[in-house]
UniProtKB/Swiss-Prot annotation:
The keyword Disulfide bond does not apply. Residues 30-144 form a coiled coil. Keywords: Coiled coil. InterPro entries: DUF4600. Residues 191-202 have a biased composition (Basic residues). Pfam families: DUF4600. It comes from Xenopus laevis. Belongs to the CCDC169 family. The keyword Coiled coil applies. Residues 161-214 are annotated as: Disordered. This is Coiled-coil domain-containing protein 169. Residues 165-182 have a biased composition (Basic and acidic residues).
Length: 214
């Protein structure tokens, strides 16, 4: 009878342990599937937009939408972790029962459960490092693009000043270019008249000696 009692006591413990492990595996599988699905969609969208990026506005729009997707993914993971923490906390009775179930677990099952928790911890740490790396890369890209944007703004400002100066120069010499041919014609006319006057004067002076000889 004692053996039967021990078996009946061990059965709920094993059932609870298996249920808890199955639930943890389901949660882990859901997280991985969700992360994989969202990352695939994000990569596909980025590859599609990479071919269609034409200006800085589209690039920043892509970065903004990517960051929104990452934020949504983090929010979902936070929600799942909160649910897990609430399930672990529960009410005092549930906590005591979980403690008793852990106390009654065999050493092998406890080691397996601890290993599962360690694997989940490593998974979360890797995800955290991945997000930190992405944030660092996005920050570097932001500063780079921001510096380029400032440089472009400076070049645009200088070009605008040069363009305004060119417009003023084009508006001022326009009047001078219209008057220049007339002035040149007048000058040429005066020069021709002076030349003809000099020639006539020379011919007049040259005719006086011939008249005196006769």
């Amino acid at each position: 009878m004692e053996n039967v009692g021990d078996g009946s006591a061990a059965a709920p413990v094993d059932s609870y342990r298996l249920t808890e492990e199955i639930q943890l595996e389901k949660n882990k599988k859901e997280m991985l599937q969700m992360s994989t699905f969202e990352l695939k969609n994000t990569i596909a969208e980025l590859e599609q937009r990479l071919n269609s990026v034409e200006d800085e506005g589209n690039e920043w729009k892509t970065r903004y939408e990517t960051q929104i997707e990452l934020n949504k993914q983090l929010e979902r993971q936070i929600y799942i972790l909160r649910e897990k923490s609430e399930n672990i906390r529960g009410n005092p009775t549930d906590r005591l029962s979980s403690i008793r179930s852990l106390d009654q677990m065999p050493v092998g099952a406890l080691n397996q459960f601890v290993k599962h928790l360690d694997d989940e911890k490593i998974l979360l740490e890797n995800q955290l490092k991945n997000f930190e790396l992405r944030i660092e890369q996005e920050a570097k890209a932001y500063y780079k693009v921001n510096n380029e944007r400032r440089m472009y703004i400076s070049e645009i400002a200088q070009t605008s000043v040069t363009q305004e100066a060119a417009k003023k120069q084009q508006s001022d010499p326009a009047h001078a270019t219209r008057e220049k041919p007339a002035f040149k014609a007048k000058y040429n006319g005066l020069a021709k008249r002076r030349t003809m006057t000099k020639r006539r004067g020379g011919m007049t002076k040259g005719s006086h000696p011939s008249n005196m000889k006769h």
